[in-house]
Amino acid sequence: MTSKAVVFAYHDIGCTGIEALLNAGYEIAAVFTHADDPRENTFYASVARLCAERGIPLHAPEDVNHPLWLERIRQLRPDFLFSFYYRRLLGAELLACAARGAYNLHGSLLPRYRGRAPANWVLVNGETQTGVTLHRMIERADAGPILAQQAVAIDPEDTALSLHGKLRKAAGALLRDSLPLLALGVLPEVEQDESQASHFGRRTPADGLLDWHRPARQLYDLVRAVTQPYPGAFCQVGEQKLIVWSAEVVAGNHGREPGSVLSCDPLRIACGEDSLVLRFGQRGERGLYLAGTQLATELGLVEGARLRGAACSPQRRTRVLILGVNGFIGNHLSERLLRDGRYEVHGMDIGSDAIERLKADPHFHFVEGDIGIHSEWLEYHVKKCDVILPLVAIATPIEYTRNPLRVFELDFEENLRIVRYCVKYGKRVVFPSTSEVYGMCQDPDFDEDRSNLVVGPINKQRWIYSVSKQLLDRVIWAYGQQGLRFTLFRPFNWMGPRLDRLDSARIGSSRAITQLILHLVEGTPIRLVDGGAQKRCFTDVDDGIEALARIIDNRDGRCDGQIVNIGNPDNEASIRQLGEELLRQFEAHPLRAQFPPFAGFREVESRSFYGDGYQDVAHRKPSIDNARRLLDWQPTIELRETIGKTLDFFLHEALREREAQA
C-alpha cells in the first residue's frame, strides 16, 4: 500500500528529499515551504518550482503550527511527516498528525552539530568529517532516535558551497536506501548518545569578522566557511570594509603584530600564528571581485600597514539597565552578560549582597536605590541605556494574599512607569511576564500564542500578581503596535543558588524549595500544602539565564514583538516529589551531620498556610516551541542536578548564619 506523506522542505536538499520520496513510491499529499527572502542570496534550487512542475499542492504559511493548519494537515491523514531543511520547528501537535511518525534529515552526523548551519560550523571548526542523518522528530530539536547516517569527508579545500554539494549527494543516497525500508517498517532506530551532543546556533554576517590574533588556520577555515554564496569573512582597512573570498595559510609571521601587512604581492597578513595570504576579495559590499595584489593597490596598502579585525575594531558595548539587579534573575543575568564581554550593565536595587562579586568589574555600575523614589535616576538611565529589564516585582505567593495592594502598586504601577519611559525614549524593553499569567489554563502545555489565560474569582486575591502581569503584557503589546520594541519572557519555576534567603523563608516570603530547605536546616516538619500534589516544571537558572541572554542578544531582531516561555518541560515534578528528592540529597550531603534529624512531612491546607484569598493550580507546563525556534535554545540540566546545587548553596548559607551568630 502506498504511504502518504506531508513534507516540510526548503533549499535544494528539500528538492532532493521530495524527489527521493517520489522515487520511493510515496504519495506526497502536500508540501510546506518558505517564501524566498529577497535579502538572502538564494543560490539553491526552488522547492516551489519543483512542486509546481510535479503538480504537488504547495503552501508557505507564516506559522505551520497554527490550529488552522494543524486541522488541514490532520484532514490529509498522513502516514508520515518529513522535514528536509525546513527552517521552523514542528510542534508536538503537528508531529502527532502522522500515523507512523515524523522524520527529519539533518546536515550533520548527529548527535554532533545539532542546530542551525551545521555545514558552515563544521568548516569554521576545522572538522575533517561530517554527514547527513535521518532521525525521528521529537519535541527537542535534532534529538530524536537515528534511523540512518551517511558520512562525508571534508577536504582541506572545501568551501561551504562545495561541502553543500557533497551533503546533497549523500542525502540523495541515504534517502534512496532508507525510504523504502521505512515504508516497510523495518528500519531500526538507535537513541542518540546525549553525552556526545553539541549544539550550534544560527550564524549572521557579523560572525565573519576576522580576528587577526587567531591562528591563520582558523581564519582560513572561517573564510572557506562563509565565502560565496555566503556574505564572506571581512576586516576593516581604515574606514573601508575588505571582504575576503579566498585565502591560503603560509608558515611564519616574521614576529610582526597580528594584522600587519607582510607583503602586498602576494597580499600577506600576519596572524597570531603563521600568516594568511588573501588570494581574492573585494572592497565593500558593491566592489569588484579582485585578486589580492590588486586589492592591496586599490586600498593603498603598504608593507607594515595594519588591518583592523575583531580584536582592534572599536565597538561600544550594549548598555543594559537591570532594575532589581540584586535579585535572583538580576544577579545571575549580570554575571552572564559581563562574562560575554559585549555588555555594560547598569543596575539598581535596595540591596547588594548577591552582587558583591560583580562590583569590581569596570563594566558593572550599581546604585543602591528604590525605583519608586529615585525617579530622576531611573528616567536618565532608561534614556542612556539600550535594553531595559524591569525585574522589580513581588513574586512570592504569600504576599499576594497578605499584601495585594502593595503587589499591584509595585508590580503594575511602578513597572508601567518604566515601560512608558521606554516608549518615550524609543528603548527596547525585555519584560518579565510570568508563568502565572496562564492561571488555571487546562491545556496540557501552556502556549504563548494560543493558550487562554484563566484566573479565579475576585475574592481569591492571590490572582492580583497574575492579572497585574497580564495587564502589563497587554499594555506592552499595545505599545508594540505603535513601535515599541519589546520581548516578553515567562520564566517557569527557575531554581538555583542565590534564589532567595533563608530569612525570607522564615517569614513565609520565599519560593517553595527555600521553604522546604529551611525545614531541613531547622529540623522542623516539611509542610506540604494540600499534600504537595501540585506539579511544576522546574528550570535550572543557568538554562534560564542562557535563554534570557539570547533574547537580549536578539540576533536579526528575531525576538522583537515575541512572547517566550522559558522553562524545562522535562523537569516536571510535584512539590511532594521535590521534597522527597531534597530529603534524599540532604541525607547524603557531606554537611548532613551539622543539622538536626529529619522531622517528617506534614500535610497542611492551603487556607491555613496562605490565607483565605489563596487558590492553587494543579499543573504548569510550558510549550517551549518559541524558545527553540527564536533562540536555538534547549534546556539541558536535569532537576536532580539543580536541586543538588540549590541545596548545597543554602546549607552553606545556614552554616554562615550560625557562625555569624556565634
From Swiss-Prot:
Binding site for (6R)-10-formyltetrahydrofolate: R116, I138, E139, R140, A141, D142
Site (Raises pKa of active site His) residue list: D142
Residues the UniProt record annotates as site (Transition state stabilizer): N104
Renumbered residue ranges of the record's region Dehydrogenase ArnADH: 316-662
Catalytic activity: UDP-alpha-D-glucuronate + NAD(+) = UDP-beta-L-threo-pentopyranos-4-ulose + CO2 + NADH; UDP-4-amino-4-deoxy-beta-L-arabinose + (6R)-10-formyltetrahydrofolate = UDP-4-deoxy-4-formamido-beta-L-arabinose + (6S)-5,6,7,8-tetrahydrofolate + H(+)
Active site: H106, E436, R620
Enzyme Commission number, as recorded: 2.1.2.13, 1.1.1.305
Record's keyword annotation contains Iron-sulfur: no
Keyword line: Antibiotic resistance, Lipid A biosynthesis, Lipid biosynthesis, Lipid metabolism, Lipopolysaccharide biosynthesis, Multifunctional enzyme, NAD, Oxidoreductase, Transferase
Pathway named in the protein's UniProt entry: Nucleotide-sugar biosynthesis; UDP-4-deoxy-4-formamido-beta-L-arabinose biosynthesis; UDP-4-deoxy-4-formamido-beta-L-arabinose from UDP-alpha-D-glucuronate: step 1/3; Nucleotide-sugar biosynthesis; UDP-4-deoxy-4-formamido-beta-L-arabinose biosynthesis; UDP-4-deoxy-4-formamido-beta-L-arabinose from UDP-alpha-D-glucuronate: step 3/3; Bacterial outer membrane biogenesis; lipopolysaccharide biosynthesis
Keyword set includes NAD: yes
GO molecular function, a single term: UDP-glucuronate dehydrogenase activity
A Pfam entry, by short name: Formyl_trans_C
Binding site for UDP-alpha-D-glucuronate: 395, 400, 434-435, 462, 493, 527-536, 614
Any one of the GO CC terms: membrane
Positions of NAD(+) binding: D349, D370, I371
Region described as Formyltransferase ArnAFT: spans on this chain: 1-307
InterPro entries, A to Z: Arna-like_SDR_e (IPR045869), Bifun_polymyxin_resist_ArnA (IPR021168), Epimerase_deHydtase (IPR001509), Formyl_trans_C (IPR005793), Formyl_transf_N (IPR002376), Formyl_transf_N_sf (IPR036477), Formyl_transferase-like_C_sf (IPR011034), Lipid_A_modif_metabolic_enz (IPR050177)
A GO biological process held by the record: response to antibiotic
Function description: Bifunctional enzyme that catalyzes the oxidative decarboxylation of UDP-glucuronic acid (UDP-GlcUA) to UDP-4-keto-arabinose (UDP-Ara4O) and the addition of a formyl group to UDP-4-amino-4-deoxy-L-arabinose (UDP-L-Ara4N) to form UDP-L-4-formamido-arabinose (UDP-L-Ara4FN). The modified arabinose is attached to lipid A and is required for resistance to polymyxin and cationic antimicrobial peptides.
Subunit structure: Homohexamer, formed by a dimer of trimers.
Family per similarity comment: In the N-terminal section; belongs to the Fmt family. UDP-L-Ara4N formyltransferase subfamily.
Name under which the protein is recorded: Bifunctional polymyxin resistance protein ArnA
